[in-house]
Amino acid sequence: MSGPNIYLQDVTLRDGMHAIRHRVDPERVGAIVAALDKAGVRAIEVTHGDGLAGSSLTYGPGSHTNWEWIEAAVTNASQATITTLLLPGVGTIAELRRAHAMGVGSVRVATHCTEADVAAQHIAAARELGMDVSGFLMMSHMAEPAELAAQAKLMESYGAHCVYVTDSGGRLTTDRVRERVRAYRDVLRPDTQIGIHAHENLSLSVANSFAAVEEGAYRVDASLAGQGAGAGNCPIEPFVAVALLLGWDLDCDLLALEDAAEDLVRPLQDRPVRVDRETLTLGFAGVYSSFLRHAEIAAETYGVDARSILIEAGRRKLVGGQEDMLVDIALAIQPK
């Protein structure tokens, strides 16, 4: 094998929670983790879609607690690192400590792309615990490359081992991904890793992930069957297939990943995870991908087109945590 040595992280059981409204049995979590672990995936993120303490009326209640899901994951992982997500202001350092005590070895601390400063305490606390820590700059399309890189530099200064270009809206085209990764590489230390988190809303997630790696990204997020918010994340099966065709240093069992996607993940979907008129609108309008299910509920409740809600959300530049505003938009555009 040749080519770049990359760190593949699965997000089926975190970002993918949005696609199934955060509803899955711990037993299925354990089965998915076991399959990913056996297939050679290096890290597996597990939590409510909005991270530790994310279960709420705003984001959507989970069918089980994060602790039940994490316990199932840790129990079934023999090689992979179990990872979790923390949004400052939602999850707390106390919850991070509990997750670490349960066996979680890595955390991504997520902020809006221009608000890295709110992550300082949480990144520092994770480092004190001895955890692997990544900064997760969400909605990365909303900041120009230089501004985004300056925010990445802040996360590095707080102690992040890695900082992600996080395309939460699936809005970035391939050239814009390249620009942001290059901007990171220009300002970050050589030993600070770069990650890419892509969404499929414009059908670019695989291409964008490869482009990021070509520009120097090391960590790549992907998910079984593309399970994730909106049209989903970078689907792990075609990503691995192309990487293997290119001779990249990626020790994953493609057939096992295909089986896990078809047998364990697709049956969970009550709404297909795919590019369609609503999810394409997310990418076109630059809207947070996890708004999809909330917008569809508001559209059905108030008799409006979900796309109209999403387009207006994009015009208003809504960000994560403003899900309640989707109802306001639906009421405003409701036929009188």
Swiss-Prot record:
Family of the protein in this entry: Belongs to the 4-hydroxy-2-oxovalerate aldolase family.
Disulphide bonds in the chain: none
Binding site for substrate: 14-15, 168, 197, 288
Catalytic activity entry: (S)-4-hydroxy-2-oxopentanoate = acetaldehyde + pyruvate
Keyword Metal-binding belongs to the record: yes
InterPro entries: 2-IPM_HCS-like, 4OH_2_O-val_aldolase, Aldolase_TIM, DmpG_comm, DRE_TIM_HOA, PYR_CT
Domain Pyruvate carboxyltransferase positions: 6-258
Broadest EC class assigned to this enzyme: lyase
Binding site for Mn(2+): 15, 197, 199
Keywords for the protein's UniProt record, in alphabetical order: Aromatic hydrocarbons catabolism, Lyase, Manganese, Metal-binding
HAMAP family assigned to the protein according to its UniProt record, in alphabetical order: HOA
Enzyme Commission no: 4.1.3.39
Name of this chain's protein: 4-hydroxy-2-oxovalerate aldolase 2
Active-site residues, as the UniProt record annotates them: 18
Gene3D superfamilies reported in the protein's UniProt record: 1.10.8.60, Aldolase class I
GO biological process: one example: L-leucine biosynthetic process
